[in-house]
């Protein structure tokens, strides 16, 4: 009985040790590679474990590349993986490029992948051109009419310029700039409506794909809409501004006139005050003249008579004016 227990313990320990060894040494992956025609040593796979590289991430794409007829080095794939690249995507791109008869080397594909580009998508776009649809672009012709233009740009990826080349946003911006320039040079918006292909030809001839990762194949005008009359709106705004300026100047003149009127009223009041002051000096002057003998008593009475006569005439004139005003009102009624 103790021998049986000892034997079971030994078997269990051996099983555990074997499980640990098999989990560390990818024997199954090595056998798969061997039967797939990929020559990779078992110690190479163990070395990947020590370098913290998952062997299936390297061996799987290598098997796929070998079956596709590509001759790739496992060290290059591992180096690309350690650099942070997507080995599977690079291998798929190389296979797609080979099928499409596009000359693409592993080093170039790896550089494109490490640059942050989707190398597989780039190969697919290089084979099957992609259509980029621009948003509605606002442009104004010389007659002041705003035109909304929507374009479709057919592009093909340029493998040689994928690293360092500008992306779709640059293509859209340049096409929009070309449309605005072309429409802005048109004498009338009717010319744009009659010949939309003139926009395509002129924009396409500007070489907008220079320095980008794409090659522009065609630019097609998808839609043209008439928007606002910018010229008339600007004239209306200018007229409104001129009116406000004129109103401001008129208000300024009115304020100056009111101020001048108030100044004149103040001057009149000041003059009246001087008259009253002068009239107050008359009795004093008469008294002084009487005391000094320069004015006789009869002269004084004559002055009093003249003053009384003047007061009476003013009263009669005022009564006559009031009667005339009353008579005029009765006639009006």
UniProtKB/Swiss-Prot annotation:
Pfam family, one: FloA
InterPro entries named in the record: FloA
Superkingdom as given in the UniProt entry: Bacteria
Compartments reported by the entry: Cell membrane; Membrane raft
Membrane topology: Multi-pass membrane protein
Keyword Membrane on entry: yes
Key word Repeat present: no
A cellular-component GO term for this protein: plasma membrane
Subunit record text: Homooligomerizes.
Protein's name according to its UniProt entry: Flotillin-like protein FloA
Originating species: Alkaliphilus oremlandii (strain OhILAs)
